[in-house]
Amino acid sequence: MTSAVFPGTFDPPTNGHLNVIERGSRLFDKLDVVVAYNPKKSYLFSPEERLKMLSELTKNYENVSVHL
């Protein structure tokens, strides 16, 4: 089983992020998308909002999980 981690702030998630997630879901058996937080950076959305957005955008990919 192959797996990969795709970390990022995803503030907000973009089409480029989704493209990487789509390609990663085809290349790996399991893809973990990790919503990162940097206290030195200002954000448009909270980590929970970004998690919710990414979860909704990736819900059709059975092998993709989104985490904080």
What positions do the PLM features span?
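Nucleotidyltransferase catalytic core that binds NTPs
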Residues: M1-L68
